[in-house]
């Protein structure tokens, strides 16, 4: 195979992997147990010091997402008609998959803890879970920033996040605490929520408003993931090598999604998110031949193996080319359409992807 042919094949494999990584588990088209999550803080414990939010309870973590989406819908008209167009939907959808796949449970071997056990304590989120730790930065941080900017109402109460004493050093518990420990991530979430009203009420076209809002959102999400990558890394020692490899691929894919300003509404999220493994991977698991996982799950894991190997081989040049090609709102719109064709149209010539990206990048 020629070098160009190899690169074209690699590009197709990598980008397919990127958008097949975040499987969505839904109930009636909405995130798992969405209807059970309270819609405002008045349903949570209130003390003299403020509202106590327990992010280690699945329902309360989902409450933060519900409040975020409900509060930002008014600023998302540029995304399209209907409340399912809000691009924040991908966050609670992914949380539902993490719950169902056992990735929010206590990962320690021979543990007496029942946290996350489907039989004993299914809605418990373990502070030792890697995915729960990463999701903390994609739920607690944006929620606190939304309250601080006034986008989400706290009913006049201070919002305090409960953190178990044994892991208190690993998690922040208030807006000021999070801003001190993670200033870059909090600043980008603050900017996102602070800019929503201004962008949505501007005289700009809906096309440009949409691109601006998505750009701000993905910049905040990517910064949160980068922050979480360092903060949660010790927890990866509790998992098998295949699971850690999968975790890293899941993290690294954010660069592709972010650069394209992907509009992650409910429909698009479900359409672009192919099946992820339905359980935590064990040391003996070797995709694509894991007997108790589906063909689709094995395929996704196999592609992730390719992604890691080829990214190392190319030294990150595919990510750089992708970012270079996504140089304008129009280019990013083309990029999303390109991903749609690549992934959802079996007749699409994936081998042409590299040349398409090269042409797009030179026209910037």
UniProtKB/Swiss-Prot annotation:
Detected in all tissues tested, with the highest levels in serum (at protein level). At mRNA level, only expressed in liver. GO terms for cellular component: extracellular space. GO terms for biological process: digestive system development; embryonic liver development; liver development. Disulfide bonds: none annotated. Residues 1-22 form the signal peptide. The keyword Nucleotide-binding does not apply. Disruption phenotype: Morpholino knockdown of the protein causes a small liver phenotype. Morpholino which can simultaneously block the translation of leg1a and leg1b, causes a more severe small liver phenotype with hypoplastic exocrine pancreas and intestinal tube as well. Its main location: secreted. Glycans are attached at residue 70. Belongs to the LEG1 family. This is Protein leg1a. The gene is leg1a.
């Amino acid at each position: 195979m020629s070098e160009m042919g190899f690169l074209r094949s690699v590009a197709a494999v990598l980008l397919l992997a990127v958008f097949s990584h975040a499987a969505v588990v839904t109930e009636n088209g909405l995130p798992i147990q969405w209807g059970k999550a309270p819609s405002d803080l008045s349903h949570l414990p209130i003390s003299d010091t403020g509202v106590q939010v327990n992010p280690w309870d699945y329902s309360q973590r989902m409450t933060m997402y519900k409040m975020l989406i409900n509060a930002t819908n008014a600023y998302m008209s540029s995304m399209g008609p209907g409340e399912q167009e809000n691009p924040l939907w991908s966050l609670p959808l992914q949380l539902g998959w993490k719950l169902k796949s056992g990735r929010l449970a206590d990962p320690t071997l021979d543990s007496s803890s029942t946290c996350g056990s489907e039989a004993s304590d299914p809605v418990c989120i373990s502070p030792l879970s890697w995915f729960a730790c990463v999701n903390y930065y994609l739920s607690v941080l944006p929620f606190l920033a939304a309250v601080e900017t006034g986008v989400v109402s706290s009913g006049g109460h201070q919002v305090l996040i409960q953190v178990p004493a044994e892991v208190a050093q690993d998690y922040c518990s208030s807006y000021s605490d999070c801003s001190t420990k993670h200033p870059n991530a909090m600043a980008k979430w603050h900017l996102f929520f602070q800019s929503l009203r201004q962008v949505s009420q501007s005289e700009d076209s809906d096309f440009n408003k949409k691109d601006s809002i998505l750009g701000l959102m993905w910049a905040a999400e990517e910064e949160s993931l980068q922050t979480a990558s360092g903060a949660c890394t010790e927890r990866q020692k509790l998992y098998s090598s295949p699971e850690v490899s999968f975790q890293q691929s899941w993290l690294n894919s954010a660069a592709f999604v972010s650069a394209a300003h992907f509009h992650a509404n409910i429909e698009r999220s479900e359409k672009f998110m192919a099946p992820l493994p339905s359980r935590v991977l064990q040391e003996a698991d070797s995709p694509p031949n894991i007997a108790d996982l589906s063909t689709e799950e094995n395929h996704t894991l196999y592609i992730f193996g390719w992604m890691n190997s080829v990214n190392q081989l190319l030294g990150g040049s595919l990510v750089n080319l992708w970012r270079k090609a996504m140089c304008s709102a129009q280019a990013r719109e083309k990029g999303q359409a390109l991903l749609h064709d690549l992934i959802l149209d079996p007749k699409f010539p994936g081998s042409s992807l590299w040349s398409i990206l090269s042409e797009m990048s030179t026209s910037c």
